[in-house]
Structures are given as structure tokens and as C-alpha cells.
Amino acid sequence: MQVLVDADACPAVIKDMLFRAARRAEICVTLVANQFLRTPPSPFIKAVQVPAGFDVADARIVELAEPGDLVITADIPLAAAVLDKGAHALDPRGNWFSRENIEERLSTRAMMDQLRSAGIDTGGPAPFSARDGKTFASQLDRFLARHGKP
């Protein structure tokens, strides 16, 4: 089991939590981004830089994902793709993507895209909060307790 991170938009506080978890649980955490990422020295942490381009990082994450892996992303289509491969998907706010909720999330995303295309301001997500970080940490700890190294 490895943790793959859609790192371009992942909050720094979440990356720091993942770095600590990698060392503590001795699991591989791979950050994928289209820019250089500084990571702490650890045999459990690595960064993969992909060329700039639409969904290039997402495609690499899908390519790397295997059944049972954990993918950290706020990207709904990416979450759907890794779920199709048997991986788990968690957003940086601690919300799980699942077979039960992914279709609804994709539909909502498509509707919001249509509204934006029509010139309607749909706003955006609320700013990342300390509560979001705590929720993420709790969900990550639970996942690692169930699926981490034996």
C-alpha cells in the first residue's frame, strides 16, 4: 500500500501530516506535481515531477495507483479514476470519495461547470480550516490503522 498525493493543490499542512505519517507508519508517500516539490529526506517520501499540461499529474497518479492504495486529491474525476482501479480516495478536508457518492459528485461538478460557462458566479470552496486539517488527520490515522503495514 502506498499513498499518492495530487500535490499541486494540496495544502502544505496536509503534506506535512503525510510526511509525518510516512515516517511513523513506514509507508511510501509519493507526491505528484507539475512543479518542483521540496520533500524532507526520508526513504518513505518521494516527489515525481511531471511536465506541465492539462491533467498530466492526474494521468501519472492513475498510472501509479494500484488496488488498496490511498490517493489524496480534491479532483473529482481523478478520484473516480482511481476508485475504478480499486484504490481509495480522500480529499484534503478529510472527506472520502466512494462508489456510493462519486456519481453525484461528478454530476454536481458538471452542473457547476455549466453554470460558470453561462457566466454565473458559483463561488468556490470555503477556505481550508484547522477543523479540515483535524478531520483529515483523523481519517488518515483510521485508514492507516486498518490498511497500513502489518
From Swiss-Prot:
It comes from the Bacteria. This is UPF0178 protein BceJ2315_16760. Belongs to the UPF0178 family. It holds the Pfam family DUF188.
